[in-house]
């Protein structure tokens, strides 16, 4: 097929989340998508890409050229359109208010590569000719503390929707979209596997905010008491879902867990230090159990169902590189 726009064939590769010609998405192979880069310059070096990627993520300059430069160009057009609409509205209302940040949400399973995508995009976007101020915040800091989760008997549900302080998360995004200065984002330590008490990152009116987390496209049940509660995605100007087959994510998760045993888990201060001292077979069994009893359930019940809410879906293949892109029609 020579055309870049794919309908039925694309839906087959993306698990039939829409049917026939009524799909709200346009589908592209990675090679077709790469052509949309046009003349977008490569502004990252190989060393920078290696620094930005997560453990066991093979992204390289070729993948940046193939996928992320076109994505950067697309996002640039959305940001420019948002700015134009803002200026037109100012003229319409005869006001001179300051534009609020453009927020990009990035969702997907654990071990699928969300953090790498977020960090690479942050650097690419910050190097646009307009030199926008770009900040990155993850939802990890909005998890309840381990002490709270233990108290509520929810530690084994960490990462599930109920383990997040949704009210605090919504207050944060509301403040960002209201254009407030010096908004505090709580910090999280992957070493101690816990939020850091009284530690925050200050977000001061960026031009663009990238908000990354497994549950950022989560929907809510309609309220029964008549109170209207916004969803996290209500604050997004653009959203991205990182996708892959369950079996691939499973393999990546276990492989990453085993590699962390040889690196981060060896730190005596690591919450998972005990896994660095057991046998490889024992560690593999634990990783499999964590996947099947926690992460797979969360993926099926809470994360994957949010995929059709994304504006753009990056579908990865066996080598952890993007094979297909789905872009929502306007």
Swiss-Prot record:
Reactions the enzyme catalyzes: (R)-pantothenate + ATP = (R)-4'-phosphopantothenate + ADP + H(+)
Keyword Cytoplasm: yes
Chief localisation class: cytoplasm
Disulfide bonds listed in the record: none
First-level EC class: transferase
Database matches in Gene3D superfamilies: P-loop containing nucleotide triphosphate hydrolases (3.40.50.300)
Enzyme Commission number, as recorded: 2.7.1.33
UniProt xrefs under Pfam families: PRK (PF00485)
Pathway(s) per entry: Cofactor biosynthesis; coenzyme A biosynthesis; CoA from (R)-pantothenate: step 1/5
GO molecular function, one term: ATP binding
Keywords, ordered alphabetically: ATP-binding, Coenzyme A biosynthesis, Cytoplasm, Kinase, Nucleotide-binding, Transferase
CDD domains in the record: PanK
InterPro entries: P-loop_NTPase, PanK, PRK/URK
GO cellular component: cytoplasm
Cell location: Cytoplasm
Gene Ontology BP annotations: coenzyme A biosynthetic process
Residue intervals passing through the bilayer: none
Chain sites annotated for binding ATP: 108-115
Family: Belongs to the prokaryotic pantothenate kinase family.
NCBIfam families associated with the record: panK_bact
Name of the protein this chain belongs to: Pantothenate kinase
């Amino acid at each position: 097929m020579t055309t870049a726009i794919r309908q039925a064939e694309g839906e087959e590769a993306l698990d039939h989340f829409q049917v026939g010609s009524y799909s709200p998405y346009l589908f592209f192979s990675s090679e077709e998508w790469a052509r949309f880069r046009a003349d977008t310059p490569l502004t990252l070096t190989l060393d920078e890409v290696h620094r930005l990627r997560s453990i066991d993520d093979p992204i390289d300059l070729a993948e940046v050229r193939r996928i992320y430069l076109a994505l950067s160009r697309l996002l640039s057009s959305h940001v420019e359109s948002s700015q134009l609409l803002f200026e037109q509205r100012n003229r319409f209302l005869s006001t001179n208010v300051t534009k609020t940040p453009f927020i990009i949400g990035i969702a997907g399973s654990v071990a699928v590569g969300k953090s790498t995508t977020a960090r690479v995009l942050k650097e690419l976007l910050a190097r646009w000719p307009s030199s926008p101020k770009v900040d990155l915040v993850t939802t990890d800091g909005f998890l309840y503390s381990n002490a709270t989760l233990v108290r509520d008997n929810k530690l084994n549900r960490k990462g599930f929707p109920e383990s997040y302080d949704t009210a605090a998360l919504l207050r944060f995004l509301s403040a960002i979209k209201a254009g407030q200065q010096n908004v505090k984002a709580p910090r999280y330590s992957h070493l101690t596997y816990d939020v850091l008490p009284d530690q925050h990152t200050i977000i001061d009116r960026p031009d663009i905010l990238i908000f990354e987390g497994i549950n950022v496209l989560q929907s809510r049940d309609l309220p029964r008491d008549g109170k209207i509660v916004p969803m996290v995605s209500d604050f997004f100007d653009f959203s991205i879902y990182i996708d892959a087959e369950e079996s691939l994510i499973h393999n990546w998760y276990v492989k990453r867990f085993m590699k962390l045993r040889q690196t981060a888990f060896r730190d005596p201060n690591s919450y998972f230090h005990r896994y660095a001292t057991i046998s490889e077979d024992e560690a593999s069994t634990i990783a499999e159990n964590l996947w099947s009893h926690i992460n797979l359930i969360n993926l099926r019940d809470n994360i994957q169902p949010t995929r059709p809410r994304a504006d753009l879906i990056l579908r990865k293949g066996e080598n952890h590189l993007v094979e297909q892109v789905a872009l929502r029609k306007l």
